[in-house]
Curated annotation (Swiss-Prot):
InterPro entries reported in the protein's UniProt record: eL8/uL1-like, Ribosomal_eL30-like_sf, Ribosomal_eL8/eL30/eS12/Gad45, Ribosomal_eL8/Nhp2, Ribosomal_eL8_arc
NCBIfam families: eL8_ribo
Keyword tRNA processing: yes
Entries under Gene3D superfamilies matching the protein: 3.30.1330.30
Biological function: Multifunctional RNA-binding protein that recognizes the K-turn motif in ribosomal RNA, the RNA component of RNase P, box H/ACA, box C/D and box C'/D' sRNAs.
Subunit and interaction comment: Part of the 50S ribosomal subunit. Probably part of the RNase P complex.
Protein name in UniProt: Large ribosomal subunit protein eL8
Cellular localisation: Cytoplasm
GO molecular function, one term: ribonuclease P activity
Keywords in alphabetical order: Cytoplasm, Ribonucleoprotein, Ribosomal protein, RNA-binding, rRNA-binding, tRNA processing
Source organism (scientific name): Methanosphaera stadtmanae (strain ATCC 43021 / DSM 3091 / JCM 11832 / MCB-3)
Amino acid sequence: MANSVYVKFEVPKEIADKVYEALEIARDTGKIGKGTNEVTKNIERNNVALAVIAEDIEPAEIVAHLPILAEEKEIPYVYLPTKEELGEAAGLNVGTASACIIDAGEGQELVDEIVEKVAELKN
């Protein structure tokens, strides 16, 4: 659903799968933020290794500020197709519009790889 106003680039399935894995590892061995309010606060504090935004959010205004804020703070961000899958990877029983990896824990190498590949996508 890359036609959303706030989606600035498409994320290949290979990278999306790695993002799900990194979120799950960080959830279990590090620290993550769940929900747009937590993500926004952590980005503003420069406390995010990777921000993750769902592509299927209606209305788009709920998350439209996140890519702009992340770029302003030079924080890497990525999109995932659905809020349900993002919520599941974040350990929630419901969908979430966004999440962030604060401390990657044992998934630091994976997060570094994702950040590198996302930087290539944006160029």
